[in-house]
């Protein structure tokens, strides 16, 4: 019914048993005797030496320790120990299996009873020998604990080993008018002290919950145990496997357990008053409790691996970042600030260093005709900080200064807004200059933008765009005769070399008219050779000419006319129409 009778053998541990194993019986939880055998054959089998059989699978050291305790209890019941030696024997038994600070807890009560309402008994280490002796003195002749079902083992934080089994059977036998056996089911939780090479594992805490009990009586006719009918007239009847005398001792120990320290202190110093004894006892109890807490913390620290030491952080070296413009970091900073201010106001940057045309990784972004370039009366300049590498929130000594723009002209701003200034017409038509070419020539491959220092950027808009003039003649200013539109349309295309300008001029010649100069407000006439375009550096035309044409030559002819005012050779062939003016009003001839 309850499985095989435990066979306590040392088959898996290499040591033969020092005593004979428990005699097999016809108990209800043991194997029934085989049919066809008689008592003589059983006696012959008992006399034969048999090897100890292992207990199923490999037994854990904690579980084997409980089996070893059962074996010692069987030795006491099977061997005759004299009355005088029993106290010493139980002291040795308690010292071998129980730690010096061990305590036994017994929780007795049936399952319907609430756990808080069940009987609780506590037995201190000092009374453990007396407890086991009272069990056998009350009439019990055998006591053992059978571990059934799976068990759990774990290591606690303080280094102790815990063992738990929820299906434990406590078997006790006693003899009165007949042989009786009491099987009590319960739950066992045992905490073992750390392993010791001399004492092995010893029990530090023992908690046994006894739930229900069944009593069986041995039948001599059938040689088997049967369930005994309840006999209320029986005086000394066990309850939960213990007799009444054992329960009386457990009740007395429950009362004496809190008083043990006080009683021991009173015996050691009889002259001290009970009040002083209680103070000393409380102080000692507090010291022991603090020591246990420190020991637990130390064990936890030993179990937790020590963290790796942190490497010291390397000393931070403050290094000044290299300037984006090695030639002048202040100029680069000012250019970046001007570009940021222009972008904030909705105007594209006009500084060459901030232009996308100078940066190959940005795609070209031509300016539309709706935008008007604007000038600013002052420029915000962000100075270089005196200490680089400072963290956020620390001292950042960036200084912001205001520099006056010397080239700012309010009148030019107003003229640009009305479309009358020289820069407005050039910038508006600058978009066509980049996208159109001469009808008789192929556009240069892959060339969308001309560099700032090229000749095309230095020439007026009238030379770059031969189609920008409206049909018909252009009205002159200040008494100057009108100029036909064919003259402006025959100017050289933007990509032709400078020396081809004379081939595109009109064929008719006309002597220059003295004393007539184009007004400063005429479109296409340069009032300042250095103001070719916003943001373009001033360049001389001689620097853009080929080497054969840039040689120094005399700047004045014998007649008193400047060389740059002389008409081309075929200018005298002009026929028809009013006499033209030389130089033409819309020409790109740079005057001295």
UniProtKB/Swiss-Prot annotation:
Checking InterPro entries in the record gives: LID (IPR041363), LIM-bd/SEUSS (IPR029005)
* PROSITE patterns per UniProt: LID (PS51957)
Q: What happens biologically when this protein's gene is inactivated, per the record?
A: RNAi-mediated knockdown causes mechanosensory defects and uncoordination in L1 and L2 larval stage animals; phenotypes become weaker in later stages and eventually disappear in young adults. RNAi-mediated knockdown causes defects in vulval morphology and gonad arms. RNAi-mediated knockdown reduces the level of bed-3 and col-124 mRNAs and increases the level of lin-29 mRNA.
One GO biological process from the UniProt record? vulval development
Which stretches are tagged as biased composition: Pro residues? 577-586
Compositional bias, Low complexity, is annotated for 322-344
Q: Name one Pfam family in it.
A: LIM_bind
Disordered: annotated segments: 14-41, 305-368, 437-458, 559-592
Which stretches does UniProt call biased (Polar residues)?
23-41, 352-368
Gene Ontology MF annotations: DNA-binding transcription factor activity; DNA-binding transcription factor binding; LIM domain binding; transcription coregulator activity
Residue ranges occupied by any LIM interaction domain (LID) domain in the UniProt entry: 378-417
What are the TM regions of this chain, as residue ranges? none
A Gene Ontology term for the protein's cellular component: transcription regulator complex
Q: In which tissues is it expressed?
A: Expressed in all neurons and some other tissues of the adult, including vulval muscle, and, in males, all the neurons of the tail region. Expressed in vulval cells.
Say which domain of life the source belongs to: Eukaryota
**Homology family:** Belongs to the LDB family.
The job of this chain, per UniProt, is described as: Binds to the LIM domain of LIM domain-containing transcription factors. Required for the blmp-1-mediated transcriptional activation or repression of several hypodermal genes, such as bed-3. Regulates sam-10 nuclear localization in PLM neurons. Has a role in synaptic differentiation of PLM mechanosensory neurons. Involved in gonadogenesis.
Q: How does it assemble?
A: Interacts with blmp-1.
Q: What is this protein called?
A: LIM domain-binding protein 1
Q: Which organism's genome codes for this protein?
A: Caenorhabditis elegans
